[in-house]
């Protein structure tokens, strides 16, 4: 219901913010499951550097994912010392990204999505996000 809400559900700003927050957390925790159990992405995971990626929405919620030896440790909230940060300018940008309704390359170019820190860590997590989207699609 909240991961794939109807448009009228998203019309309420508080419900929209809740849906984005729930989806952000689902992405962080879903990456763990995909990364540790999907044989398609396991080779990528085994070559990921150790570190912490923080996913956050400017002036909004955050989640982070620590990667160590091919295992994932997701948590809600900001990371103490992230190695890389994936930051969305606002709730709408985050939502559009999670729903696959945004050209991420142009969003990075326009500053709606900001990448900071050890970018190869974010690049390594990106295929896991894509694979998670595959599992969550209709």
Where are these regions (language model features)?
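Feature captures hydrophobic
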Residues: 1-138
């Amino acid at each position: 219901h909240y991961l794939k809400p109807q448009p009228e559900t998203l019309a309420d700003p508080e419900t929209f913010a809740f849906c984005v927050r729930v989806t952000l957390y689902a992405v962080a925790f879903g990456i763990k499951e995909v990364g540790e159990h999907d044989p398609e992405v396991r080779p990528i995971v085994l070559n990921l550097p150790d570190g912490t990626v923080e996913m956050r929405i400017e002036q909004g919620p955050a989640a982070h994912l620590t990667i160590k030896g091919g295992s994932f440790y997701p948590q809600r909230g900001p990371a103490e010392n992230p190695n890389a940060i994936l930051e969305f300018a606002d709730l709408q940008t985050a939502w559009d990204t999670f729903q696959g309704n945004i050209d991420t390359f142009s969003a990075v170019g326009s500053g709606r999505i900001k990448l900071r820190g050890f970018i190869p860590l974010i690049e390594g997590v990106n295929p896991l996000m894509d694979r998670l989207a595959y599992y969550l699609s209709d």
